[in-house]
């Protein structure tokens, strides 16, 4: 049987992720004009003390974290409340005692999140946007470092510092670089390593930990694709295998992003290891468990891409590919199979009964697996059969949503 075409899953993996910019509304309050906390409804834990200032602050952060994050209203409320507590703490020793590591961390998080809105402020000049983004990041880092000076063993504060660094690299630095940029003072590798040094799996908040790892995932994707041009439409409109090819552009060694590109493999390995640790520390009944497993599956499929290309270039050579020796192809096949099987393990864990899209991702991985197995072998036929069965069930459950994907596969 010939190599089967790839549909939804493959196209999804090859689409470049984009850093989301959120537009700032013209009537949004500024930091100085933020309304007082009493004007904001805050959901607290059942056992929280209504008079506990810190509990209310945590409630505000949770409100923002679990929202659509489409405006800065709550963030400004957090900053306003933190400023108020700092002023009161100068005269009230009891309040000063409540300003623990959580206080400093939430304050720093709010400041760092405001950079997203500053970067997307269309009413400001480009110069002002850059200045505001830099200023808020500096304030956020100053705040978390001040907190660490009082609570040096705080795992939460160290994690917040890592988050700010991972967020700052693309938003403040990479976004302002072009292909010919040269800046010897901008050490992006050093910053990334500094962030990784402070990162750890925070068992008290696996959801927050997951988001930070996703930031690193997005950052590595931005680094990998920096300088490339592509015209892939948003969303998946068809299952045509003929997709736009990315144009590789080699950066000069003096370019600030170049060293990051050279360390991609090691950083992806770090990312996979930490996602794996996070999965081990997350209960299977927790909502984000499937998301963590899904991300791991995608990362292992990504790891399998290069050896897959080497093997398939010989297995299904059309005469136009660079010649690959049998030994190289065999080694590549074994490596690609290893990573693809690992990806399948995670994607199976990520499969949700009420989400046929997750079934299709598993089916696509089985197609990848079949393409890597010896041609017309019993194992290959079994992999393709499994993929067909899963696609059929997903298509039926979704009332024909994946008919094109299924047809494309069967015609291969």
Swiss-Prot record:
InterPro entries: Nro1/ETT1 (IPR024318), TPR-like_helical_dom_sf (IPR011990). The modification Phosphoserine is found at residue 30. One of its GO terms (biological process) is regulation of translation. Its main location: nucleus. Residues 32-41 have a biased composition (Polar residues). It is found in: Nucleus. Transmembrane segments: none annotated. GO terms for cellular component: nucleus. Residues 1-45 are annotated as: Disordered. Keywords: Nucleus, Phosphoprotein, Transcription, Transcription regulation, Translation regulation. Residues 17-31 have a biased composition (Basic and acidic residues). The keyword Transcription applies. The keyword Transcription applies. Required for correct translation termination and probably involved in regulation of hypoxic gene expression in association TPA1. Inhibits replication of Brome mosaic virus. Belongs to the ETT1 family. Interacts with STM1. Present with 10800 molecules/cell in log phase SD medium. This is Enhancer of translation termination 1.
């Amino acid at each position: 049987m010939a190599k089967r075409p790839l549909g939804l899953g493959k196209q999804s993996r090859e689409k470049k992720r984009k850093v989301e910019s959120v537009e700032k509304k013209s009537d949004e309050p500024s930091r100085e004009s933020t309304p007082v906390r009493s004007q904001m409804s805050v959901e607290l834990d059942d056992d929280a003390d209504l008079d506990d200032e810190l509990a209310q602050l945590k409630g505000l952060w949770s409100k923002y974290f679990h929202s659509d994050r489409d405006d800065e209203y709550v963030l400004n409320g957090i900053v306003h409340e933190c400023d108020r507590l700092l002023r009161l703490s100068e005269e009230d020793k009891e309040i000063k005692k409540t300003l623990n590591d959580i206080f400093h961390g939430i304050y720093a998080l709010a400041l760092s999140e405001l950079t997203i809105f500053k970067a997307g402020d269309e009413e400001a000049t480009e110069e002002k946007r850059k200045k505001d983004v830099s200023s808020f990041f500096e304030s956020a880092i100053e705040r978390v470092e001040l907190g660490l000076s009082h609570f040096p063993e705080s795992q939460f504060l160290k994690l917040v510092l890592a988050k700010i660094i991972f967020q700052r690299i693309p938003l403040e630095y990479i976004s302002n670089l072009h292909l010919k940029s040269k800046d010897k003072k901008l050490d992006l590798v050093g910053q990334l390593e500094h962030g990784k040094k402070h990162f750890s799996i925070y068992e008290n908040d696996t959801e927050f930990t997951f988001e930070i790892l996703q930031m690193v995932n997005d950052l590595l994707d931005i680094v990998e694709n920096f300088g490339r041009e592509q015209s892939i439409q948003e969303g998946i409109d068809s299952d045509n295998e003929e997709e736009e090819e990315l144009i590789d552009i080699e950066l000069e060694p003096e370019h600030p992003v170049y060293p990051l590109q050279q360390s991609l493999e090691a950083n992806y390995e770090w990312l996979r290891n930490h996602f794996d640790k996070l999965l081990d520390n997350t209960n299977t009944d927790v909502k984000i468990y499937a998301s963590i497993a899904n991300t791991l599956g995608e990362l292992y499929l990504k790891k399998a891409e290069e050896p897959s290309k080497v093997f398939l270039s010989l297995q299904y050579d059309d005469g136009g590919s660079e010649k690959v020796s049998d030994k190289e192809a065999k080694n590549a096949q074994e490596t690609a199979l290893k990573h693809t099987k690992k990806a399948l393990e995670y994607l199976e864990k990520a499969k949700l009964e009420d989400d046929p899209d997750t079934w299709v991702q598993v089916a696509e991985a089985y197609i990848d697996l079949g393409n890597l197995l010896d041609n017309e072998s019993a194992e290959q036929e079994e992999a393709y059969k499994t993929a067909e069965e899963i696609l059929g069930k997903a298509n039926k459950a979704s009332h024909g949503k994946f008919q094109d994907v299924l047809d494309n596969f069967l015609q291969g």
